């Protein structure tokens, strides 16, 4: 028997497609029939960059005042009970805390970029604190 060249053909065998559930079929056909428009979505990263620009321009405090005040009072309880705070003292603490956090995140971002990443990780924060000479 002579050898013949084989050509690729589409397969007709295999499993038959399963029937869709009624709800899935209804869901697929509904948007086409009703013409419901999908909400607009920005590309990933666009909104993040917009927020970065917005917060770099602003000078207002980003942590809410009352939760920060509760945290300060809770931490102060460990050292001495019945402490009282002037509102300006809590405001100064909040300003200092936010300035520290912003600075730490800047250094953390530099550490992530140095590692050829764009996402910060806990090890970046640890490295930034270590380079600053802070205890971790």
From Swiss-Prot:
Lineage top rank: taxon: Eukaryota
GO cellular component: nucleosome; nucleus
Pfam families in the record: Histone
Region ranges (Disordered): 1-41
CDD domains in UniProt: HFD_H3
Oligomer and partners: The nucleosome is a histone octamer containing two molecules each of H2A, H2B, H3 and H4 assembled in one H3-H4 heterotetramer and two H2A-H2B heterodimers. The octamer wraps approximately 147 bp of DNA.
PANTHER family given in the database record: HISTONE H3 (PTHR11426)
Listed name of the protein: Histone H3.1
Gene: HHT1
């Amino acid at each position: 028997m002579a050898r013949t060249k084989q050509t690729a053909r589409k397969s007709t065998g295999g499993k038959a497609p399963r029937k869709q559930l009624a709800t899935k079929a209804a869901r697929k056909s509904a948007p086409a029939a009703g013409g419901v428009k999908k909400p607009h979505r920005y590309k990933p990263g666009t909104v993040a960059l917009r927020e970065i620009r917005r917060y770099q321009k602003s000078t207002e405090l980003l942590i809410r005042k009352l939760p920060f005040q509760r945290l300060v009072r809770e931490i102060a309880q460990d050292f001495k009970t019945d402490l009282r705070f002037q509102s300006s003292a809590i405001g100064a603490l909040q300003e200092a805390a936010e300035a520290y956090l912003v600075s730490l995140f800047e250094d953390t971002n530099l550490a992530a970029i140095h590692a050829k990443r764009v996402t910060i990780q806990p090890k970046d924060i640890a490295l930034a604190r270590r380079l600053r000479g802070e205890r971790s």
